[in-house]
């Protein structure tokens, strides 16, 4: 089958031929565009924008648009996009993935398709893996876009809704996948349309597309609200778990050394000692029989497996996970008495994110910090379904071809390998494999010292904060100066990475994926010039303007720009000399301390094309990847070799085993992602329906007609259910009266007319009750209008309230269904199909409950007389008393004469965003102050 696949797949050369022709068309425009003045070049944007919004296809505008960006980049950034960058840009515009090696200039590549697609006026999102890159790229590339007459926005954590809305309204918007996803969810929770911040999802260019669309796809985005449960049980469960003894599987000694298949065929009985055991491959923990007995005794329950003790069991299991599986300074860090998640792919702290399902609370109990209340899911979506909403999606990465099947299957994205501008001249050395971690770390330190002594810069890659700090301590003991970049030292990230290629530099970094800052051999003159200006007292804003190319600036900025240019030129001389010196030493040496579970992360660490350098991994048999996923052959090989811990093994013997372990891990993670998506696809259909209906309400759809339909539906369903018997004498009219009496029909209209109703057919009963209900609703509207309420606004508000409340309950119910649905497989039933069928029934129930809640609120909710409230509010604000009853007025006057006149302090007029004093719960500007 493989040869057929190869036969049907066009060669890379054939795929690139039409792209080369388009690149030729762009090149042909360069002489003409070079002659344009800055103003004439800017005017090109207005011309192209008018043509695009007039209906001309973007494909026809591509050569001119790309040529404009290239010329602008030469003038503003001092960089001319290479031909391969233009080809990469064309691929992105076509809605495909451009695989471009590290160092090929992906940031500048994205500028061309972003500019082209922004001409339509529908917005372009450039998605980065972290806030730092969004801010950095937004500022750097913003200089180019603004020069060409485009607006640029950056979405960062901590912005106000107004700032976010302004950023999204720009032609081009930079932001992280997290921020974009959460803003989408928040937009579908607002009560007023003007509070929404995002526009439609038009075109997205995803940087490090494999990290975002594949690695992070296992974790859904969740917006949570605080739950109501006490946190005491987390602390109690933690105290209990700390008393338990971890058990191990006891294998049959007669079958020791045999493969798992042989042991299974021989019927091996596996015993587990201790109170609990951990499956590291599945990252799960389970109580043994001994552990269950201890739990029952400790918590005073008879049977832990009783359904009534499910919640207690959940607390215990989460405490076990927190203590036996989750590692401090690997999975999370503790800062400022808070447990903070470390992103396993980037090594950064995930600010504001919490583990779900009570795990975060269990970790807080373990670390003896304040245990926050367990959260409740308010809204959720997976990255897969979020990014599939874009009309056009594309991405860039250095490593995507190996995952092409997943990109095509889930996102319908093809991968195109872009040839490198410079040949790959990095030297990748064989792995050094040690039997123990201890021996490996000693060898790593010795290798660093050996290379540092020559002046060669060394970048050490680790996969956890814990290992980076261990190596840092070992280097300090040996007197080696170095920098550490991890989740605890992220503030100086740009400075540390920028100087990692300096002569003699030693840098320890956790997960280099998506660092985004160039490592220049010999040092970075731009960074050095900026650093000097900061030391001299220049403000960051002045430095940013000074390093740009805008002509409309003050004399202060022009002076700062001249100073920056002078400093950069001086440092450039130094770094050029240092560059040649470092190249002579072999360039930057990359030293990996452990193989990552993804081969792509390893390749990203290995570094850039075009720069001379070398890379090597130091690994041990005790590393998690080999220990958990290495398989039986790796364990047998390790035990048979029996070498001492300081002697490296022949890596060639183990290369295939290591690669197989990584492939197994990648395959397992792919299955997890597929599994997550299969379930979320079911939820996504329901989410789209709810959000679509919600948006229609926000955009002013006639809600009144919907309310009437709801009343009709509820009455019709109730009559059909209670009057289903062919014999009218057996109709359950009492039940019908009880049900509709809690909604929209007075019970006496049914119980007081039973004989009449039994003479009618079901359609006639429905029509009669509907007419009664609608007449009551008309009177209710008259009453509430007299009270000063807008009935259409109340309908809108009550409907949104009901939808939001029931949708949250539905999410919880779906989570519970999903947690237990896997057990259906034991009954030979497909869990996915079972989930689909049950979730459909649950969705129907939710829709019915929304109808009931909305109608009940509109008919029966106690709503204050707003006019009376307003009179009282006016009296409170002005110090007057609006009393109509003359006797009451006389009584008040008499009381006033007796007590003497007392000054009344008039309250200040409420601000537009203050709560309205009438008590409606709305902001003043949306209530009594609406007409001001």
Show where each model-derived region lies.
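Conserved P-loop NTPase motor core
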Residues: 1-625, 630-642, 692
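Conserved phosphate/pyrophosphate-binding and hydrolysis machinery centered on Walker-type P-loop NTPases
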Residues: 16-19, 34-42, 55-66, 82, ...
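Short amphipathic alpha-helical coiled-coil/interface segments
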Residues: 23-26, 41, 45-52, 62-73, ...
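Core structural elements
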Residues: 65-70, 92, 173, 209, ...
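Substrate-binding beta-hairpin/strand module that engages nucleic acids
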Residues: 123, 259, 263, 377-378, ...
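Structured DNA-binding interfaces in DNA transaction proteins
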Residues: 446-491, 673, 677, 686, ...
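Arginine-glycine-biased low-complexity disordered regions
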Residues: 618-676, 681, 687
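Acidic/negatively charged segments and metal-coordination signatures
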Residues: 664, 693-932
